[in-house]
Amino acid sequence: MGRIEKAFARSREQGRGTLGVFVTAGDPDQETSSRILDAVVAGGADIIEFGMPFSDPMADGPAIQASSLRALKGGMTLDKTLKMAEAFRNRHAETPLILMGYYNPIYIYGAQKFLEKATAVGVDGLIIVDLPPEEDEELCLPAKQSGLNFIRLVTPTSDEARLPIVLAEASGFVYYVSITGITGTQSAGSASIADACKRIKSVTNLPVVTGFGIRTPEAAGEAANLSDGAVVGSAVVDIIANNLSDDGSTNDEIVQNIAAFVGNLAEGVAAKQR
């Protein structure tokens, strides 16, 4: 059983939802980003989604777009992201780490080289938001052959005809995008999440986590109650932006505030027991 499976199994045994937290590699700088990763784990996150900075993150809202730009401005690269992943794995043997982002940086880096390094440093899976199942041969199938999970996104517009196609090669879990549009904006209603999860579960036995638009412990708890877990990203990234000094320098409050917020999120998903 891999780390992702173990994370969901632990959550089920404890009668709670699984908490995923997204942060961008190298935001606001590499040293602080490493400390943020540790704070997220300490706060109670079950799964880390580690964003690979990209200059044109089309599915992301203003918060994560700004996060990527801060990281890139600080000199973050895909190679440095992989080195951060390796250092994270050396510090945290059991927490699943998923690389999330867009295909362009991977293509430029070299897909096979990327997969070899990601596997070697202890990455557990990939979420590549702009690679549809029609392009599985580009990365999905080679990733799975390398031992990496390939997590698929399902949206509110994914109908009964499309779902089996999207989920045919999915592994690890399914990420339900609860809103149409970009990250960090409006939130979805409970009825729509419940209906979507029912449709997804009719096609796959994989766990389903809900993300996009989840900004509070209460919303995370509700999403975890309706699915198998919740992912929070923009609200965490906002803490970085809101605590930077005017000149862009960092301070200890960023790490402390993120740890506290993730702790509250963990309490939220624990409070919504089924």
Feature locations, PLM:
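Active-site-adjacent beta->alpha loops and helix N-cap segments on the catalytic face
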Residues: 1-11, 30, 55-66, 76-86, ...
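Alpha/beta catalytic cores of nucleotide-metabolism and tRNA/nucleoside-modifying enzymes
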Residues: 198-204, 215-225, 229-274
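Catalytic cores of alpha/beta
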Residues: 30-41, 158-168, 210, 214-230
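Alpha-helix-loop-beta-strand connector modules within alpha/beta enzyme cores
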Residues: 62-98, 141-151, 155, 192-208, ...
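Hydrophobic faces of well-ordered beta-strands that scaffold small-molecule active sites
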Residues: 19-23, 48-50, 97-101, 126-128, ...
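Glycine-rich phosphate-binding active-site loops on the catalytic face of alpha/beta enzymes
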Residues: 45-55, 125-127, 176-184, 213, ...
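Active-site/ligand-binding-proximal alpha/beta "capping" segment
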Residues: 116, 175-180, 184-229
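Active-site mouth loops of central-metabolism enzymes
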Residues: 19-35, 98-110, 149-158, 186
